[in-house]
């Protein structure tokens, strides 16, 4: 007779009015999780930075006004005019015609920064989804441990009543009663530890999702997203992982930063329109109006080596970005390998724990029968109870660890949100339209 007593114990867990699936938990967290909102705020701010850079393509219009007392003295020391209230009013319109490609490169750099920040946002959402999935599954496991612990107490209480009855008949000693009571106290302690863990998990869930868990449903990972081998898993991770994509865009942004700094080696050409309407200027009473349109050029011949130093600094930042990209590749490969190993071995391990439950259950039943006829000691019976309790806990743990390993492996390949069928917020989708078409092409360059 098999006595797994694991998954069936969880059937009564769903008893609240509203159901909250894993997918719904992730979707809700994407809207209100503070850590994710931080990433989103940075993503939005980058768009504003790009808009600010783009403004250099447009005319710059400024209005100037001034008024005050003017006194002019000739070289001979005589006052030219006694009192005049000088008034100035001017309008200047400047259109940049050539900035050494500074605006072009800055806009291009920020476009890559936007793409990098979006991938960082997706990566944060992927990792948050994994955290929620793990806590979600741990809640089920903790509920199972609670029920196992309660049954363990019930079993020991039955044994205690039986031993007390036997002691009254002279078939067992007071030491036997004390021994069972000691084991019962340990069982109560284990139950309290299980309750503590369960409520800690509820707090963790609240931290991630923003609400306390109510009615949960056992999740099942879509096996279509589970790779068949480690090689396939690594290949998917390299192609899809948002951290890798973000690091690639960071390198491209660093390249554009170099080009932007080099723009200071070029002259700047502007078209400038000035219109002035003044009064009492230069000691002459009355209006003094003028207007002009000029083509201006400025060329920085020497800046103390600043331009060269800034260009070299940008080149080193590119090297830093490349090193981060290479390290990201290694971390993704390592994470995928660890996730694959966990998934593979916990699946095999679960089969042995199942056998452990079978044999421990058979041994416990046999020991109890032998104890009744005096062929086994009370200690043997109690030890067999503990062994069965531990075997059931191990099988319970392995069953849920297998589920956690499945989600971890899918996350390692960068496809967890897709597997959960969770749509990212609409604001992400709108920004995505601006940059996603070229994302794959840029990553593959």
Regions found by a protein language model. Give the residues of each.
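Positively charged n-region of N-terminal signal peptides that target proteins for export
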Residues: 1-4
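N-terminal signal peptide c-region/cleavage motif recognized by signal peptidases
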Residues: 12-16
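Periplasmic alpha-helical coiled-coil/stalk elements that build and connect Gram-negative outer-membrane
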Residues: 20, 125-238, 250, 339-342, ...
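Small/polar (Gly/Ser/Thr/Ala-rich) solvent-exposed segments
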Residues: 37, 60-84, 94-123, 245, ...
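Amphipathic alpha-helical coiled-coil segments
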Residues: 38-53, 124, 128-148, 165, ...
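Transmembrane beta-barrel architecture of outer-membrane proteins
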Residues: 86-88, 134, 179, 290-292
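Membrane-embedded beta-strand positions in outer-membrane beta-barrel channels/transporters
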Residues: 90-92, 136, 270, 294-296, ...
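Acidic, low-complexity, intrinsically disordered peripheral segments
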Residues: 394-445
């Amino acid at each position: 007779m098999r006595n797994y007593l694991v998954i069936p114990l969880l059937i009564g867990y769903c008893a609240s009015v509203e159901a909250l699936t894993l997918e719904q938990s992730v979707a809700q967290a994407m809207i209100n999780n503070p850590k994710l909102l931080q990433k989103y705020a940075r993503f939005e701010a980058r768009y504003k930075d790009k808009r600010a850079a783009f403004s250099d393509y447009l005319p710059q219009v400024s209005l100037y006004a001034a008024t005050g007392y003017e006194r002019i003295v000739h070289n001979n020391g005589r006052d030219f005019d006694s009192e005049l209230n000088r008034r100035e009013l001017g309008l200047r319109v400047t259109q940049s015609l050539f900035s050494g490609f500074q605006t072009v490169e800055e806009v291009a750099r920020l476009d890559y920064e936007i793409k990098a920040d979006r991938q960082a946002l997706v990566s944060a959402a992927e990792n948050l989804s994994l955290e929620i999935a793990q806590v979600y599954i741990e809640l089920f496991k903790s509920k199972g441990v609670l029920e196992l612990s309660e049954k363990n107490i019930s079993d020991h209480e039955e044994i205690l009543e039986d031993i007390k009855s036997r002691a009254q008949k002279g078939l067992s000693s007071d030491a036997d009663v004390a021994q069972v009571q000691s084991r019962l106290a340990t069982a109560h302690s284990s139950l309290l530890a299980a309750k503590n863990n369960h409520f800690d998990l509820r707090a963790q869930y609240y931290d991630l999702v923003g609400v306390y868990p109510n009615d949960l449903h056992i999740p099942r990972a879509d096996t279509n997203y589970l790779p068949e081998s480690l090689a396939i898993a690594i290949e998917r991770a390299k192609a899809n992982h948002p951290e890798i994509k973000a690091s690639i865009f960071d390198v491209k942004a660093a390249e554009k930063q170099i080009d932007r700094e080099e723009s200071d080696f070029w002259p700047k050409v502007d078209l400038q329109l000035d219109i002035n309407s003044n009064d009492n200027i230069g000691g002459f009473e009355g209006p003094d109006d003028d207007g002009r349109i000029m083509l201006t050029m400025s060329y920085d011949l020497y800046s103390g080596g600043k331009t060269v130093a800034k260009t070299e600094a940008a080149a080193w930042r590119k090297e830093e970005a490349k090193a981060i990209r290479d390290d990201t590749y290694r971390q993704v490969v390592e994470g995928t390998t660890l996730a694959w190993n966990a998934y593979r071995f916990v699946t095999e391990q679960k089969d042995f724990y199942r056998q452990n439950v079978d044999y421990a259950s058979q041994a416990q039943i046999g020991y109890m029968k032998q104890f009744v006829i005096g062929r086994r000691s009370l200690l043997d019976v109690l030890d067999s109870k503990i062994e069965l309790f531990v075997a059931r806990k191990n099988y319970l743990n392995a069953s849920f660890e297998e589920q956690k390993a499945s989600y971890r492996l899918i996350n390692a390949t960068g496809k967890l949100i897709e597997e959960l069928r969770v749509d990212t917020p609409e604001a992400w989708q709108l920004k995505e339209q601006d940059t996603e078409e070229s994302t794959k092409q840029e990553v593959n360059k």
